[in-house]
From Swiss-Prot:
This is Protein LSM12. One of its GO terms (cellular component) is cytoplasm. The gene is LSM12. Keywords: Acetylation, Cytoplasm, Nucleus. Disulfide bonds: none annotated. The modification N-acetylserine is found at S2. Residues 82-179 form the AD domain. Interacts with IGO1, PBP1 and PBP4. The lineage of its organism: Eukaryota, Fungi, Dikarya, Ascomycota, Saccharomycotina. PROSITE patterns: AD, SM. Transmembrane segments: none annotated. It is found in: Cytoplasm; Nucleus.
């Protein structure tokens, strides 16, 4: 005997999907237009409510467990959605986009892994560090060109030698660290 899914609303069901994952709960809804089941997986009077939406094409086995509820108030039960602060969501989204753009600016395009590592090490110490093509520019005064060795550090403006010794030390230590890491990677 075949039973319409709409007639089983409110029943406890056990669904096994094609990956043999079993979900138990109350059948909350069946949508024939997009061929999905919504199963309420939380216990009665538990808040917040948890639901699983399962595409019927992924169902391997569906079993109604338990007897027919004597009083099926489930069809009339309405779960009120939680309040969502839209302004807060928009603010978090904007902050996330800004952080993502900032992170993207810190990634060199077409540079070697060593070059990116050197950039990251300099940026940790000196925040005013940026990529210009494949060159690392620090404080708009110092440039480090590929292959990003100490001898590739150039002063852009005469008289701005104050920060060059610090940058040379950072680059030197970074290369030492890279060489140590390469030694550990050996197979």
């Amino acid at each position: 005997m075949s039973v319409s899914l709409e007639q089983t609303l409110g029943f406890r069901i056990k669904v096994t999907n094609v990956l043999d994952v079993v979900t138990e709960g109350r059948l909350y809804s069946f949508n024939s237009s997009n061929n999905t089941l919504t199963i309420q997986t939380t216990k009665k009077n538990q808040s917040p409510q948890n639901f699983k939406v399962i595409k019927c094409t992924f169902i391997k086995h569906l079993e109604v467990i338990g007897d027919k509820p004597s009083f099926n108030s489930f069809k009339k039960q309405q779960i009120k959605p939680s309040y969502v602060n839209v302004e807060r969501v928009e603010k978090l989204l904007k902050e996330s986009v800004i952080a993502s753009k900032k992170k993207e600016l810190l990634r060199g395009k077409g540079v070697s892994a060593e070059g990116q590592f050197i950039f990251d090490q300099i940026f940790k110490t000196i925040g005013d560090t940026k990529w210009v093509a494949k060159d690392i520019i620090i404080l708009d005064d110092v440039k480090v060109q590929p292959p990003y060795k100490v001898e590739d550090i150039k002063v852009l403006h005469e008289g701005s030698n104050q920060s060059i010794t610090l940058i040379q030390r950072i680059v030197e230590r970074s290369w030492e660290q890279l060489e140590q890491d390469d030694g550990r990677k050996g197979g």
